[in-house]
């Protein structure tokens, strides 16, 4: 089994399914609202419709076919496939979906130039961990669709499985750094035992996820 990541960051740490800390970002504010959903007036940019997948579609993750349970845009090119592995039957409860809502997701690569504020938090977390290799950074928007409109979710999470790049060192321990709007930063441990993949929890709403190796 892979080693479990254990680290103390220079901030208040709360143990749950992951280690949560506060890291400074530009224009950092308070945490997200506790409301279940917020209706947006329009759908967010879908970033490469050619990479759309339907719910239940077969996606190659680390060379192995995996069914992704959420429809959306899977545009991450820095990894060997990504798929939501939370069972479709569990999505409504996991994300507090109401009648008529269907889970939806948008995943794409980002970097220092595109996500400057979030990367400040990512780099601070890496430094607090004593250093780590940055493997890939993704922007992920986990929401829902209702009557053709995007619904922003604020509660719940799903499991996302990602195939590590071909050049990844499989002897290292992999984890993910999640940065949410406002600067809240969470270290997410790998939930699977496959040395060629990493599985972590994706929170409802928009977040930046940096996969690291240590």
Predicted regions and their residues:
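Gram-positive cell-envelope targeting signals
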Residues: 1-27, 175-177, 187, 209, ...
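Tryptophan-paired
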Residues: 145-147
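Feature for mature exported/ectodomain regions
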Residues: 2-3, 17-136, 152-166
